[in-house]
């Protein structure tokens, strides 16, 4: 307290604690982690909560191929806060971490690791390299998660490569196939030419690309219904005008699609006629920079042109004019270039016209085949410019506009993808879509917009392409008849494959021939033959992770189905949330989760996406090294994670300051609890001063706020309530006011303050334990213990409101007292500015009061009132006087206190020297020293 040494310093009860002001978290946290591991914290916590209601937060498996980033840290810490809080709230909340271990990124890493040998290794050898890579990264990522303070069963995580997982996944596939939800067919799918595999919608990301949009004319070759003759239009000079942004698909053109409900016009340019939608004539002419043209005759219904024929722009074949409702007037010409092999709408409309072939002149690597004629061997992206140049030279191109548009990219390699019709395995969403809608309605979505988002995605999505033309994954468990090629999936084959995988893992698919796997007696339903081959595709990794509700929730004895919560980032609405929902509804008829909680992306301090190339990223390891994991955890709690969360070095620096204020509150209290034994030194409630009861009432309000925040997973609310309590209620008020009582007195008055502070810190520490898991344990270790307190704070019960609650009259009284104190502080500041006083203890305050204010202030003993104002003397005077204040009926005047300054407590008093042995002490301090 004193800056200058005094002979009485040793008689003061100055704060004394080994709890350090500087946190030193980067060094302390690893020691705590070691202690938690040696004492088996997680498993003992589960035993401690055995028999309590369960809360199951099911972990969405991160991909096991690299170090964690800030987004992963955000995700895992949110989960850990929930798990810790639920375990303190009266639940047994196990946490089984999972890892997604199959898929293309790992396969590509494995291939790159073998270099030139990749052409020589077998599929089985490649899979073994992949498994080794995935397993190594599981260990790396697990250590990184634990370093963040995440607790869970890391000794027994669930892995999608485990035999028992793969076996259960096969069974889910079989259940869906049995219900008719799995089929194989030719359809256009997202295809990555670089990865050489089909992709699901969840594996697509959109980026802005430059492209040439062109208007191309196709010459009419046949008019079987005499439409042109009817309107006096010469067929040999008539063209349909199409618009496309994918020039490379023109070799696959087999039809031009019109809308039968739209009107079309004949536009004469020179002596040639061009058919296009009436409403789009002007925009087409403007785009083609054609100013001299004439619309001939009246508009014609699009339906009249059906089944006309036209010549391909360069190949020796004819196409068909067909009708489709997907044709709009939003852009283009109203005549849609239709290549059934390269577009979903195109494919679907062509299915209505059996005479229209599906042509796919592009191979797995994105190269045009001989079906493209002279462009065979060209990569599709290069072919765009070559075909455009040739068609422009031939006069087929009427106009060209360079545009930027959003184009789909592979989220693995980030390169543009194409639509390509191939034989693939699909999950028929259309067959159970209504059931999915009903399941969505049973789920609690947080934020609530998640309900409509998921419903909209399910409504708009096509059938799910679940096959991939790769090696590292769970094989499609299908057999093919050698004689007729029909695929074969039965209950018996599914059981045989599942049993085999459970015993040997999915590598067995590559070890044995089909006849060694398929049960004896299986015959082809179509031709009766019994010789077989195996499917060579693997399942989409989203089918892997989408099966966790069966392979994990139903199989692990400590878990249950459905989960109470799935919690992931917003991108999982098209990923894990959705794949899990689809497989669960398809196999069980219900959602796999009762609630879904969603968080946003991590962005930089300016709100921009983090990229290594931009140099705006920040790594969890950097923050841990500089500040400790608790600061990352505080960042998570202080953020509104339902939207994008900003992260950066400045933000973490600011948070470290906020953390310091919370830590110093705890340190001050611990320092003043030196020598305090809660088993013997706690005073009864009626011995507490009013301000102590006010502090406990403020604590009760904190409990109410934080309980409410935790209940709805609003940790931002918890953080702000804790921060304001520590800074405003404690440091700026209660702890400041009680310093004289703590430092300068002994007996009941001091013990009353210590009693309140002890209860405050015990409660506060429990409240922050789910968030600041390391710091709260450090505080807990320094707190004096009572019987029944656990070694680890996470084993304690979360505080419940009511124990320290005060009635509204008491709260109103103290709100008024604090308002009076604020007015006194203003006057003291003015007196300090005028050099009347220095420190506030040099002041004597006169309060001029009306009757109501007088009665309020007079209800507090004058020495306690002086302590409340942190002055040496307070006098109450009925009537007007002093400076007017914001408190009605109150005037405030301040003067230098009379008497001398006590060497020990620094208060001014006229009792200085009243004890001859202590001539520099006030009577109060002299009696304390002599006691």
What are these regions (language model features)?
Residues 2-25, 31, 35-39, 111-251, ...:
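Residue patterns forming the tRNA-binding/recognition surfaces of aminoacyl-tRNA synthetases
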Residues 47-109, 242-251, 257, 322-349, ...:
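N-terminal catalytic cores of NTP/NDP-binding nucleotidyl/phosphoryl-transfer enzymes
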Residues 100, 189, 193, 199-207, ...:
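Acidic, turn-prone loop/beta-hairpin segments
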Residues 189, 407, 478, 521, ...:
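Residues immediately within or flanking Cys/His clusters that coordinate Zn2+
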Residues 192, 410, 481, 524-527, ...:
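Short cysteine-rich clusters marking metal-coordination/redox-active sites
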Residues 196, 469, 485, 528-529, ...:
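Cys/His-coordinated zinc-binding microdomains
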Residues 222, 319, 353-366, 470-472, ...:
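Alpha-helical recognition segments enriched in aromatics with Gly/Pro capping
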Residues 255, 262-335, 344-348:
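Protease-associated
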């Amino acid at each position: 307290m004193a800056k200058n040494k005094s002979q009485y310093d040793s008689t003061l009860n100055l704060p004394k604690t080994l709890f350090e002001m500087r946190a030193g978290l980067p060094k302390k946290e690893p020691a705590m982690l070691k202690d938690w591991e040696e004492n088996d914290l997680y498993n003992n916590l589960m035993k401690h909560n055995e028999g309590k209601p369960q809360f199951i937060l099911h972990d969405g498996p991160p991909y096991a191929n690299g170090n964690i980033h800030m987004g992963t840290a955000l995700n895992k810490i949110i989960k850990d806060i929930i798990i810790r809080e639920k375990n303190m709230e009266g639940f047994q909340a196990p946490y089984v971490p999972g890892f997604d271990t199959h898929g293309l990124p790992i396969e590509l890493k494995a291939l790159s690791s073998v270099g030139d040998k990749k052409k020589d290794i077998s599929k089985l050898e490649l899979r073994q390299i992949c498994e080794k890579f995935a397993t190594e990264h599981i260990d790396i990522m697990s250590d990184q998660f634990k370093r963040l303070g995440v607790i869970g069963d890391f000794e027994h995580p669930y892995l999608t490569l485990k035999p028992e997982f793969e076996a259960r996944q096969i069974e889910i596939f079989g259940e869906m196939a049995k219900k008719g939800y799995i089929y194989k067919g030719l359809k256009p799918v997202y295809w990555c030419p670089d990865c050489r595999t089909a992709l699901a919608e969840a594996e697509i990301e959109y980026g802005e690309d430059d492209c040439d949009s062109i208007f191309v004319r196709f010459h009419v070759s046949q008019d079987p219904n005499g439409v042109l003759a009817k309107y006096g239009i010469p067929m040999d000079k008539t063209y349909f005008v199409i618009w496309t942004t994918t020039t490379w698909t023109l070799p696959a053109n087999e039809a031009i699609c019109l809308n039968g409900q739209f009107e079309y016009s004949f536009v004469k340019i020179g002596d040639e006629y061009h058919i296009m939608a009436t409403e789009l004539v002007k925009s087409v002419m403007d785009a083609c920079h054609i100013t001299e043209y004439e619309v001939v005759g009246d508009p014609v219904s699009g339906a009249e042109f059906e089944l006309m024929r036209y010549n391909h722009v360069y190949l020796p074949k004819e196409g068909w004019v067909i009708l489709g409702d997907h044709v709009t007037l939003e852009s283009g010409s109203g005549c849609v270039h239709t290549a059934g092999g390269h577009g979903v709408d195109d494919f679907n409309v062509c299915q209505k016209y059996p005479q229209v072939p599906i042509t796919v002149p592009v191979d797995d690597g994105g190269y045009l085949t001989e079906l493209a004629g002279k462009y065979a061997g060209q990569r599709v992206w290069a072919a765009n410019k070559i075909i455009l140049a040739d068609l422009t030279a031939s006069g087929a191109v009427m106009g060209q506009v360079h545009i930027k548009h959003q184009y789909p990219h592979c989220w693995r390699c980030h390169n543009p993808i194409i639509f390509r019709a191939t034989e693939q395995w699909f999950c028929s969403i259309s067959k159970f879509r209504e059931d999915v809608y009903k399941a969505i309605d049973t789920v609690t979505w947080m934020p609530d917009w998640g309900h409509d988002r998921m419903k909209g995605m399910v409504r708009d999505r096509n059938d799910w392409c679940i096959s991939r033309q790769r090696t590292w994954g769970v094989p499609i468990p299908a057999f093919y008849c050698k004689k007729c090629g029909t695929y074969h999936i039965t209950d018996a084959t599914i059981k045989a494959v599942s049993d085999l995988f459970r015993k040997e893992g999915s590598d067995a698919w590559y070890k044995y021939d089909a006849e060694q796997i398929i049960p004896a007696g299986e015959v082809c339903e179509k031709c009766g033959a019994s010789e077989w081959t195996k499917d060579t595709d693997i399942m989409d990794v989203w089918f892997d992770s989408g099966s966790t509700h069966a392979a994990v929730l139903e199989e692990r004895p400590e878990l249950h189905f459905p989960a109470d919560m799935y919690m992931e980032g917003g991108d999982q609405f098209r990923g894990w949330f959705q794949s899990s929902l689809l497989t669960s509804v398809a196999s069980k008829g219900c959602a796999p989760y009762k609630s879904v909680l969603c968080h946003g992306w991590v962005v930089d301090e300016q709100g921009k996406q983090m990229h290594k190339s931009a140099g705006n990223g920040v790594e969890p390891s950097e923050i841990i090294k500089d500040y400790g994991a608790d600061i990352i955890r505080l960042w998570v709690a202080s953020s509104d994670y339902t939207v994008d969360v900003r992260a950066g070095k400045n933000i973490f620096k600011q948070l470290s300051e906020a953390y310091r204020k919370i830590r110093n509150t705890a340190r001050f209290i611990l320092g003043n609890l030196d020598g305090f034994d809660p088993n013997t030194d706690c005073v009864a409630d009626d011995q507490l001063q009013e301000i102590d009861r006010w502090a406990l009432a403020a604590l009760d309000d904190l409990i109410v706020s934080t309980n409410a925040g935790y209940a709805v997973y609003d940790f931002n609310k918890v953080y702000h309530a804790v921060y304001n309590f520590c800074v405003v209620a404690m440091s700026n008020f209660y702890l400041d006011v009680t310093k004289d009582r703590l430092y300068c007195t002994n007996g009941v008055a001091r013990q009353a303050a210590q009693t309140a502070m002890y209860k405050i810190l015990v409660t506060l520490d429990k409240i922050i334990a789910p968030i600041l898991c390391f710091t709260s344990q450090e505080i807990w270790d320094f707190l004096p213990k009572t019987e029944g307190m656990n070694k680890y704070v996470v084993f304690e019960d979360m505080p419940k409101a009511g124990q320290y609650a005060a009635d509204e009259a008491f709260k109103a009284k103290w709100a008024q007292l604090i308002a009076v104190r604020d007015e006194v502080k203003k006057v003291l500041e003015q007196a300090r500015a005028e050099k009347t006083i220095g420190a506030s203890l040099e002041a004597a305050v006169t309060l001029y009061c009306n009757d109501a204010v007088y009665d309020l202030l007079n209800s507090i003993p004058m020495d306690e009132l002086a302590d409340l104002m942190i002055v040496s003397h307070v006098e109450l005077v009925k009537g007007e006087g002093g400076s007017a204040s914001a408190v009605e009926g109150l005037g405030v005047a301040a003067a230098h206190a009379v008497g001398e300054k006590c060497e020990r407590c620094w208060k001014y008093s006229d009792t200085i020297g009243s004890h001859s042995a202590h001539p520099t002490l006030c009577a109060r301090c002299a009696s304390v020293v002599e006691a």
